[in-house]
């Protein structure tokens, strides 16, 4: 079940949960903080230079030590510019490094999760966890942290200077600070809620837009453009309304902050002016106080805004941690990892060769998000080299069988044996490295034909690639492409037809030279002529390999060593094609019905 967006209360805003990532850059972060403190100290002292210039050079009408004053001012300015450059560079680099680490950690963890996680969480949600949440966390541990350090220390230094210059005048200004904090917090709380709502609406609009593009063919053929368009316009109108609300609060907010700054300035001018007229304060001192009174509000606003944003960012932190701490439904035991390694650190020297014997022993199975048993007390022995075809209606349990063989899911009860040993006694990577899997809906990765085929065998030569293509009668796909193996297939193989993508998927699986081959309705998307060519290749390729073929077209499995007819998670018929046809049972009905439909289609 997809996690809900909700307010989450974590100690210290959840920051301790992400400190392990920041600790990798602790010395850089310490240096950034020190430079931020120095920069805020210098910034708070600039008005003091103006005070000295007005009181000394203007007030006393003298130019002595002016050269030293200018040199000192320029020197400090140059040092600060250099430190600011280094600080900004390091903060940016730290943000990018943290984003990279957070995204790599989350993406790598996703590779280790079972299919159940992806069934329960949509792509947009997972994408937001990897990209958006990690980006917010990286920003928090870099720019937002430096905002608090610089602005917080600047406020402290300014308040110290104000008290040192005139504690009475400082107290009059400080009286406004609690009111300013209350007003800023009041508006910020509402702005955070509105901005959170805007982000949710933006995610919905992005999702709708994506569906509008990917589902363009279905939208046009079902003539539902107006329905989809109305829904999209409703979402954008809602977002406009909420955004206008946020803009209204933003306008009130900045107007109020400006008013508070003006009140502080008025107090300083009123009281400071009286002190200056009565020769109790110099004009330069009044000038520096006015600068401080005006300048303290923006840093105060920034600190409160950052602290307020922590309430929102802690949701990002919690969701990110939920992802990286999600345990896979299918996981190798510590003992297996110790011997065979894990997904990213395999110990191939300990891998035994896979022969291909497969057996189900008293297997019960239900999906993690389901209540009903798909398989109950299921038993099956498949000697190595056997070609097993599985047929049955939708939901009968065909794909469940091969999913358990591939260990995409674990049995609820019982065992799946590979070469006589429980599949859980060896690593998932060991098993997957010996399985070739071709799906009904083929998937190609962005890149060239060569790149895609080498996912089956990274060290494959062009000769090996062409041999695999020849086995599945797919050389024509390459020959008609301008750049041959170097031709780009487009995103998801979008530049190829479904049949062409399927042929390349076959070649990729065969190139891996698997001991177990799984074809999950793999010829369902191929036209009849292509099917005949590839069927001849499959008959050749599966020799000597254990193969499981889930058949959509029963004509493709007539040569199978054994055909299993599955209904409600149980094998109701078993035998060769000729044996099952003689029985005139359920398989006979399926085959006869499909044959009659094929004849009708041919005549039509």
Regions found by a protein language model. Give the residues of each.
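Transmembrane helices of ABC transporter permease
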Residues: 24, 28-41, 69, 73-79, ...
């Amino acid at each position: 079940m997809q996690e809900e967006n909700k307010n989450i209360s974590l100690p210290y805003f959840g920051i301790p949960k992400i400190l392990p990532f920041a600790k990798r850059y602790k010395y850089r972060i310490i240096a950034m903080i020190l430079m931020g403190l120095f920069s805020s100290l210098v910034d708070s002292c600039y008005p003091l230079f103006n005070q000295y210039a007005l009181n000394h050079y203007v007030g006393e009408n003298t130019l002595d030590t002016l050269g030293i004053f200018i040199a000192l001012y320029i020197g400090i300015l140059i040092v600060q510019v250099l430190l600011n450059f280094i600080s900004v560079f390091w903060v940016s680099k730290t943000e990018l490094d943290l984003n990279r680490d957070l995204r790599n950690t989350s993406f790598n963890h996703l590779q280790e999760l079972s299919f159940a996680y992806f069934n329960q969480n949509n792509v947009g949600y997972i994408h937001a966890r990897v990209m958006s949440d990690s980006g917010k966390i990286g920003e928090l541990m870099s720019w937002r942290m430096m905002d608090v350090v610089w602005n917080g220390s600047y406020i402290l230094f300014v308040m110290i200077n104000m008290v040192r210059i005139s504690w009475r005048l400082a107290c009059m200004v400080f009286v406004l600070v609690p009111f300013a904090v209350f007003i800023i917090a009041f508006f910020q709380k509402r702005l955070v809620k509105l901005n959170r709502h805007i982000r949710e609406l933006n995610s919905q609009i992005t999702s709708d837009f994506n569906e509008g593009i990917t589902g363009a063919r279905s939208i046009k053929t079902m003539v539902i453009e107006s329905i989809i368009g109305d829904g999209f316009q409703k979402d954008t109108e809602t977002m406009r309304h909420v955004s206008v609300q946020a803009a209204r609060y933003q306008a009130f907010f900045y107007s109020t902050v400006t008013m508070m700054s003006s009140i502080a300035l008025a107090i300083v001018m009123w009281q400071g002016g009286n002190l200056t007229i009565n020769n109790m304060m110099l004009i330069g001192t009044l000038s520096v106080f006015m600068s401080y009174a005006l300048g303290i509000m923006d840093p105060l606003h920034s600190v409160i805004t950052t602290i307020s944003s922590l309430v929102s960012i802690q949701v990002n932190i919690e969701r990110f941690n939920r992802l990286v701490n999600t345990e896979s439904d299918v996981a190798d035991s510590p003992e297996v990892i110790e011997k065979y390694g894990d997904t990213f650190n395999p110990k191939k020297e300990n891998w035994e060769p896979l022969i291909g014997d497969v057996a189900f022993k008293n297997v019960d199975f239900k999906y993690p998000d389901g209540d009903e048993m798909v398989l109950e007390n299921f038993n099956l022995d498949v000697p190595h080299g056997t070609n097993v075809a599985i047929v049955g209606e939708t939901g009968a349990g065909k794909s469940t069988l091969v999913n358990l063989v591939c260990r995409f899911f674990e049995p609820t009860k019982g065992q799946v044996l590979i070469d006589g040993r429980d599949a859980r006694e060896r690593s998932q990577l060991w098993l997957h490295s010996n399985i070739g899997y071709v799906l009904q809906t083929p998937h190609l990765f962005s890149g060239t034909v060569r790149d895609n085929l080498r996912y089956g065998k990274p060290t494959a030569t062009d000769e090996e690639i062409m041999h695999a293509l020849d086995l599945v009668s797919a050389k024509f796909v390459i020959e008609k492409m301008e750049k041959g193996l170097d031709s780009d297939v487009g995103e998801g193989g979008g530049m190829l037809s479904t049949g062409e993508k399927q042929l390349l998927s076959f070649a990729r699986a065969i190139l891996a030279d698997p001991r177990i081959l799984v074809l999950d309705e793999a010829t369902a998307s191929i036209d009849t002529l292509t099917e005949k060519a590839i069927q001849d290749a499959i008959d050749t390729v599966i020799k000597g390999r254990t193969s499981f073929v889930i058949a959509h077209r029963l004509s493709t499995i007539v040569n199978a060593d054994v055909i299993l007819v599955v209904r409600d998670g149980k094998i109701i018929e078993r035998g060769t094609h000729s044996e099952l046809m003689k029985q005139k049972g359920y398989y006979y009905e399926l085959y006869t019905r499909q044959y009659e439909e094929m004849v009708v289609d041919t005549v039509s």
